[in-house]
């Protein structure tokens, strides 16, 4: 079970680093001083993210023996599996950002790649805050960075709808299916 958790966690972050690195390098989104980051732009962060994803693939290509951690062996994914991890997680991050992008009010000058840079920066801020789901932090960064493209009240409605679609709806469906499963299991 621990191996699966580590594999999934690694996949989650590899996708974030790969798509975040790519978008950050291509978009050159400025970082507001309010966020107190050591960089004025996301470009250096993008380079670091791409280096991490590349280093992972390189390590998986060079290492043949399982890693030993705390007396347990972790198998090394093959190169196709490593690329699959990155691809699947990157697509997941892209879809997540695209859901919010589609919900946003029409804005001139806001391209999908530019929005993805903003979205991923907001997601990173939310994750680094250690607040469950980045609740409030994610929305604040989105509002701050998209305020030049749209009215904050319209953005807030889109953010609320995004939370509903991407978090609450899957939870409700899963809860319903679990309840049905439990009821049928008792019969």
Can you say where each PLM-predicted feature lies in the sequence?
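Membrane-interface helix-entry/capping residues at the boundaries of transmembrane alpha-helices
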Residues: 1, 156-159
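Juxtamembrane loop-to-helix connectors within ABC transporter transmembrane domains
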Residues: 1-9
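Short amphipathic alpha-helical coupling elements at transmembrane boundaries
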Residues: 3, 72-75, 143
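Predominantly cytoplasmic-facing regulatory/coupling regions of multi-pass membrane proteins
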Residues: 11-16, 21-127, 152, 157, ...
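Re-entrant/interfacial helical elements at transmembrane boundaries that shape
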Residues: 132-147
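Alpha-helix C-terminal capping segments
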Residues: 147-149, 161
């Amino acid at each position: 079970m621990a191996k699966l958790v580590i594999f999934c966690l690694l996949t989650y972050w590899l996708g974030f680093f790969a798509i975040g690195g790519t978008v950050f390098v291509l978009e050159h989104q400025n970082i507001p001083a309010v966020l107190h980051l050591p960089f004025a732009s996301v470009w250096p962060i993008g380079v670091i993210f791409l280096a991490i994803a590349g280093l992972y693939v390189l390590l998986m290509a060079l290492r043949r023996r399982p890693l030993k951690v705390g007396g347990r062996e972790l198998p090394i994914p093959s190169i196709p599996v490593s690329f699959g991890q990155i691809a699947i997680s990157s697509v997941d991050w892209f879809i997540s950002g695209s859901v919010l992008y589609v919900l946003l009010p029409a804005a001139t000058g806001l391209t999908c790649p530019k929005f993805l840079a903003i979205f991923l920066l907001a997601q990173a801020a939310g994750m680094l805050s250690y607040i469950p789901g980045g609740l409030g932090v994610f929305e604040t960064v989105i509002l701050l960075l998209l305020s030049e493209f749209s009215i904050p009240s319209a953005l807030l409605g889109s953010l609320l709808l995004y939370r509903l679609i991407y978090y609450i709806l899957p939870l409700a469906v899963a809860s319903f299916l679990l309840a049905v499963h439990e009821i049928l299991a008792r019969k």
